[in-house]
């Protein structure tokens, strides 16, 4: 095990919105250190989202943040071994981990989608998440369902 907890890295805000959350998302989206490409994908996806939801009074960034909130899980199950049996113990998730899980799920399910470009797939997944639909939202619902089903083992807290 580690001796000390590692220091959090300082993440700079993105150039367009000045938001650290956007940079964190783009870092998850990025392949092979190609951050500019990842930023282009993200910004074009947000433009497409605004085009798909023209009568929405929110900005594209607010829609993206609302979509992330919709797919953010509150509880997860962790395996815990007690006397030869393994139990799925529901535990609350730390705020930074919640954010990380929701971002990763949005990207994973966007990549699995059918579509021409990654920007199109990402925008479609953002719109679905905003409307409480799609693969990422279903993943959150499944996590909550698993935690609810295993609530009897909550006393095995970590």
Swiss-Prot record:
One of its GO terms (molecular function) is tRNA binding. The keyword Ribosomal protein applies. The keyword NADP does not apply. InterPro entries: Ribosomal_uS7, Ribosomal_uS7_bac/org-type, Ribosomal_uS7_dom, Ribosomal_uS7_dom_sf. GO terms for biological process: translation. Part of the 30S ribosomal subunit. Contacts proteins S9 and S11. One of the primary rRNA binding proteins, it binds directly to 16S rRNA where it nucleates assembly of the head domain of the 30S subunit. Is located at the subunit interface close to the decoding center, probably blocks exit of the E-site tRNA. Belongs to the universal ribosomal protein uS7 family. This is Small ribosomal subunit protein uS7.
């Amino acid at each position: 095990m580690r001796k000390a907890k590692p220091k959090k890295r300082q993440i700079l805000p993105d150039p367009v919105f000045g938001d650290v959350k956007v940079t964190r998302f783009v870092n998850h989206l990025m392949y092979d250190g190609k951050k500019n490409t990842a930023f282009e994908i993200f910004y074009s996806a947000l433009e497409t989202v605004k085009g798909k939801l023209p009568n929405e009074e929110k900005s594209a960034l607010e829609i993206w943040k609302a979509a992330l909130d919709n797919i953010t899980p509150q509880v997860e199950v962790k395996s815990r071994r007690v006397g030869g049996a393994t139990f799925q113990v529901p535990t609350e998730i730390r705020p930074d981990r919640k954010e990380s899980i929701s971002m990763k799920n949005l990207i994973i399910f966007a990549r699995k989608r059918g579509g021409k470009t990654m920007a199109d797939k990402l925008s479609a997944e953002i719109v679905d998440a905003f409307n409480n639909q799609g693969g990422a939202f279903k993943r959150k619902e499944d996590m909550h369902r698993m935690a609810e089903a295993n609530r009897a083992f909550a006393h095995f807290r970590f």
